[in-house]
């Protein structure tokens, strides 16, 4: 295929001098967090007051648009210093103070977003200024501020604005509480070794004990997933799956109902028929009808595959019940899913996950992963010894552009679970890469937070292959944060359309299914030997295992999210149970309330969970069209990717970036093939 046109800004060097300063600090006491929050609010409000009280004839680019952009840079950094510790600090007092700071700052954000005086001056500036006198990104920034003003109802009567402001404040506090409840959940189940039959010794040895010598199984990922995959005692799996999907059931169920009600009310005041339509206006999909069609069509295509996979699982379950002398109930329960999906991998594809993880010690995976990213994107990483961090497990790396030697950013790695810590894997942007007030470029800083299995005195941290995939995915977000070269904080890093934001990192997951990269990030933790060729081939083939059921479950979650945000009366638990039965063919466990544990619903993905599947269309297309054709470790394609897809941040529309990188408009073919589906006139991708 002919390589696409050169990408905008191929020269990755930027004219602006770079300020390689880390403005972040992690040594604040709970009291200081409270004091600095008040100070930050006062400082920032002064800038908005200045802009909002100017005479209209005095409004200019410098004293209005630039003033707002400059304060956004300093405010974003200071805000992250104050509100990020709620997710990672080992000290409960600091986490609590940080959560309180987040609540105050979120209320303040609402106040500032509803400043009609500021909005009027921005509108006035747009009418007054010659559009071609602004740099393209500045013009986009101006247009975006006006669009956001209208989306906050600043063109509506004052009374309506007050209602919207009140709803927005309530929403932000409810979202913080919803996720805080999940993070702070310390539920555990005391179990005996016998009840954990099937789990490996290293897992059992890593568990804390209760006073009566039982083992403590928490509901955090490093306990929950291995147990559901490997424990051959159905009753233990049932108890743990039920407890997991009953976390924070009472409090979060009430919060979720209120979130859904308030979102619908706000969207209606703004003239939208549903909250989903309000949210989607800013995305690639544009309307809830487009999303519904996408999910329905994909579900129809995947259902036959799901049926075949369920039949295989029932066969396996019947054989297992006979072997272990258990009653066979003739159905698949929610607590059976992961166990038998794992058995499919082990029996049909002969992939022994316990053996495999011995080849993925954390240090080797990290070294290989960092090496691949450096080579692919033309970067060099350097570990900063003795850096100031929030916990002794955390590492800080600086990142340079390999060609120019310039520092472009830094990233923190915080990879192991702790009590009170954020419970999933995520990338947090902490310092936006953008221009500062004096015109110099501020480097981007991000943190990757995860919950991989901790090392023990007998063994290093050993990663399951799906954890290696998660590591690659989240680190892809880190690279998006660091490689973007936007001028404005609003467009820095991953500030792209929400149904595109996952595509760059999803694309990079492909590397953990290819032989060459896999060999570079693995070796046996005791012998140092490489993964045997046969095991490697089986692993790569197993990518197609359970693809129907896995993706149908993603559709269930996306449809629950859409249902809650298009039909206000929908009951979350009932809707989830109905869709599980209808689409997945596996009932939800009675009495559970999965949506009350679904952090995405309160974490900025409201009406947007479909984006994971939607953006896979683009990630599959990018990988198969460029990397698979021209070389998966090709530095040339890697640099095209860095300059076309990562470099702009959100300063261009995703559709424009994709067309530049692909040399054409995106297509669904590679996505459908990757799901094990037939596409007319296309060969399945070589595995």
Curated annotation (Swiss-Prot):
Presence of keyword Coiled coil: no
InterPro entries assigned: MetalloPept_cat_dom_sf, Neurolysin/TOP_dom2, Neurolysin/TOP_N, Pept_M3A_M3B, Pept_M3A_M3B_dom
Tissues expressing this chain: Ubiquitous.
EC number: 3.4.24.15
Subunit structure: Monomer.
Source organism (scientific name): Sus scrofa (Pig)
Protein origin, superkingdom: Eukaryota
A GO MF label: metalloendopeptidase activity
Record's subcellular location: Cytoplasm
Phosphoserine PTM sites in chain numbering: 172
Active site: 474
Name assigned to this protein: Thimet oligopeptidase
